[in-house]
């Protein structure tokens, strides 16, 4: 087995443990799913003991380190001040540090920047790759990604969102409306794959409409030039975009 298998096991050990720490927020079905994920992860850990011996606690610690660049939240969405409204529902956004570097050789990630006639607004271009529909507004290989994950106890779903920006032009370059995927373990793995593959955006028509509204109103903001995220400024900025509307 590869080192990737070990890392995946460590990640799932960390995620399962963190989710069960907020057991009171999970309904019975969701709790059973997470417990099943924990059991299967422990079984994988025993299988890997012949070539990568480690304790459950060690796996959790390493999984937490591997999780650097993303953030898993099991708090109530109402605790997050910034949100985007879609079909009358508000989807919260949270911000986390992430790496600033191209990822892999994803053809969509490596596609060129596409400015419109006046060079100020970046045209959204639809791509279809491996069954996913993605929207690319621009690409300078300098993306900063952030992800928000929230297990929804009532629907047994995992929602996630990406906010992307370009440090070269100091503009927002992409935005992914929170999307729900079925199954806790499947959803978490899908989030990991999105990050590792460098996919910029997976969207539907509603998401694209909101994206176009946000990018057309993109403006210079001190946050985008910062070396590290300024959480308060960013949340206030995204909140102002939502309140301004299309």
From Swiss-Prot:
Provide this UniProt record's keywords sorted from A to Z.
Answer: Host cytoplasm, Host nucleus, Host-virus interaction, Inhibition of host innate immune response by virus, Inhibition of host interferon signaling pathway by virus, Inhibition of host RIG-I by virus, Inhibition of host RLR pathway by virus, Interferon antiviral system evasion, RNA-binding, Viral immunoevasion
Record-linked InterPro entries: Flu_C_NS1 (IPR005187), Flu_C_NS2 (IPR005188), NS1 (IPR004208)
Q: Where mainly found?
A: host cell
**Location in the cell:** Host cytoplasm; Host nucleus
A GO cellular component annotation here is: host cell nucleus
GO terms (BP aspect):
symbiont-mediated suppression of host cytoplasmic pattern recognition receptor signaling pathway via inhibition of RIG-I activity; symbiont-mediated suppression of host type I interferon-mediated signaling pathway
Report a single Gene Ontology molecular function: RNA binding
Output the Pfam families linked to this UniProt entry.
Flu_C_NS1, Flu_C_NS2
PTM comment: the record says:
The NS1 protein of strain C/Ann Arbor/1/50-pi is phosphorylated.
Changing residue 189 to K has the effect of:
In strain: C/Ann Arbor/1/50-pi
Q: What else is known?
A: The strain C/Ann Arbor/1/50-pi causes persistent infection.
Q: What function does the entry list?
A: Prevents the establishment of the cellular antiviral state initiated by host RIGI, which normally triggers the antiviral transduction signal that leads to the activation of type I IFN genes by transcription factors IRF3 and IRF7. Also participates in the up-regulation of the splicing of viral mRNAs.
Q: State the family it belongs to.
A: Belongs to the influenza C viruses NS1 family.
The UniProt entry, under HAMAP family, shows:
INFV_NS1
Name of the protein: Non-structural protein 1
Origin organism lineage: Viruses, Riboviria, Orthornavirae, Negarnaviricota, Polyploviricotina
